[in-house]
């Protein structure tokens, strides 16, 4: 599957659907971004069931700002509408494949429970 250009207009709809979305925040002038692009594109071909989206931080400054992107490339993984990974830096192919494997293995019911407990603890501590 080819990568999809993500914009302010389609980001929420495409990345908050069921399934896994890998999102690469990048810019044309960024050397590490250009080095990571073939790794990301090849992974999209190997995993057609996953959305591989790219956000051009130069063209989509509001989107990059909304996600607090301060370093590129930054890779995010969203599973079933929940952000489960966010890290700046380019990954080598083996590390990207391991990340995809780990995202597939997540028990999303458990992730949601943990998030709910964290929010409750934070709310309880703040009171």
What is each PLM-predicted segment?
Residues 55-63:
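Structural microenvironment flanking redox-active thiols in thiol-disulfide oxidoreductases
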